[in-house]
């Protein structure tokens, strides 16, 4: 029986950035850290200038002739690029409607599970459809279902705003929550006064 082929399970090496000594081109068009054109100079001279500035020589356009490098703080540049990428990803997030289903008679543990699910959806930037399902004659308990949904809205008020108040939809009662954009301002009556220190009796 022929031996089974062996697969290389090692993680692929990350592509290293073309900076400093990793740049292999002998001649480079160099832009200084302030945007000044230093012209076409040798790789060694470019590295020397970057070293004098206590900065990095970074290859920014490999396809140009000769390749273009810029003298910069690569660590700061990388941080700003990653920050921009995260912001772009956040803006490109398509808002979805996630649904949390429950019965009007729900125990505390299951209720907390639904709260956790809704919290996770809201943090991801999605809207939440809270649905109370009625079966058979349970439809007569719409008041209890409405109370449950209002309780959920109250428990999530720091993270969510009510987009649509509880209402009947067929044999269900629904409520829509959307991620809160502005911080919740507590009423003065909800702000607890600091506890007074207890007096000791000698």
From Swiss-Prot:
It is found in: Cytoplasm. GO terms for biological process: ribosome disassembly. Gene3D superfamilies: Translation initiation factor 3 (IF-3), C-terminal domain, Translation initiation factor 3 (IF-3), N-terminal domain. It comes from the Bacteria. One of its GO terms (molecular function) is ribosome binding. The keyword Transmembrane does not apply. Keywords: Cytoplasm, Initiation factor, Protein biosynthesis. The keyword Cytoplasm applies. One of its GO terms (cellular component) is cytosol. Monomer. IF-3 binds to the 30S ribosomal subunit and shifts the equilibrium between 70S ribosomes and their 50S and 30S subunits in favor of the free subunits, thus enhancing the availability of 30S subunits on which protein synthesis initiation begins. Belongs to the IF-3 family. This is Translation initiation factor IF-3. It comes from Prochlorococcus marinus (strain NATL2A). The gene is infC.
């Amino acid at each position: 029986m022929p031996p089974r082929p062996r697969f290389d399970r090692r993680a692929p090496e990350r592509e290293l950035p073309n900076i400093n000594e990793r740049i292999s081109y002998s001649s480079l068009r160099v832009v200084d850290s302030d945007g000044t054109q230093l012209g076409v100079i040798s790789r060694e001279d470019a590295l020397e200038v970057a070293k004098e500035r206590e900065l990095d020589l970074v290859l920014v356009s490999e396809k140009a002739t000769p390749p273009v490098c810029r003298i910069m703080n690569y660590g700061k540049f990388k941080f700003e690029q990653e920050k921009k990428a995260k912001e772009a990803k956040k803006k490109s997030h398509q808002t979805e409607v996630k649904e949390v289903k429950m019965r009007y008679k729900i125990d505390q543990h299951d209720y907390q599970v639904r709260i956790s699910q809704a919290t996770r959806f809201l943090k991801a930037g999605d809207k939440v459809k809270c649905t109370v399902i009625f079966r058979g004659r349970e439809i007569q308990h719409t008041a209890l279902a409405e109370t449950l949904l209002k309780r959920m809205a109250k428990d999530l008020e720091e993270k969510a705003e009510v987009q649509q108040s509880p209402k009947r939809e067929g044999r269900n009662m629904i409520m829509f929550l959307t991620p809160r954009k502005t911080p919740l301002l507590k009423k003065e009556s909800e702000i607890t006064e600091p506890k007074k220190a207890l007096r000791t009796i000698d």
